[in-house]
Amino acid sequence: MILEHVLVLSAYLFLLGLYGLIMSRNMVRALMCLELILNAVNMNLVTFSDFFDNSQLKGNIFCIFVIAIAAAEAAIGLAIVSSIYRNRKSTRINQSTLLNK
């Protein structure tokens, strides 16, 4: 695959996730946009690892670590969101004043 095509796709995914993260008012949607950003970073890691140093798998191994961290982040984030929803009956970011106290 051509390097430029993958980089353009990765940049598009990153910008789409960044736009969604900035504009979203729902916590679950913000978590999904954060996952899009992390997947764009993973695409870059694997692409550059394959393109510049094909004999070593450092980018692929680091990508696996990022996926594991993203899974833990998603699990903790969804647990926090479900706890906030149980207490506040809303998952909107601008209505949550839990951290202001």
UniProtKB/Swiss-Prot annotation:
Location in the cell: Plastid, Chloroplast thylakoid membrane
GO cellular component, one term: NADH dehydrogenase complex
Organism, as annotated: Lobularia maritima
Reactions mediated catalytically: a plastoquinone + NADH + (n+1) H(+)(in) = a plastoquinol + NAD(+) + n H(+)(out); a plastoquinone + NADPH + (n+1) H(+)(in) = a plastoquinol + NADP(+) + n H(+)(out)
NCBIfam families for this protein: PRK05715.1-2
Record-linked InterPro entries: NADH_UbQ_OxRdtase_chain4L/K, NUOK/Mnh_C1-like
GO annotation terms (biological process): ATP synthesis coupled electron transport; photosynthesis, light reaction
Quaternary structure and partners: NDH is composed of at least 16 different subunits, 5 of which are encoded in the nucleus.
Lineage: Eukaryota, Viridiplantae, Streptophyta, Embryophyta, Tracheophyta
Name of this protein: NAD(P)H-quinone oxidoreductase subunit 4L, chloroplastic
Family of this protein: Belongs to the complex I subunit 4L family.
Gene that encodes it: ndhE
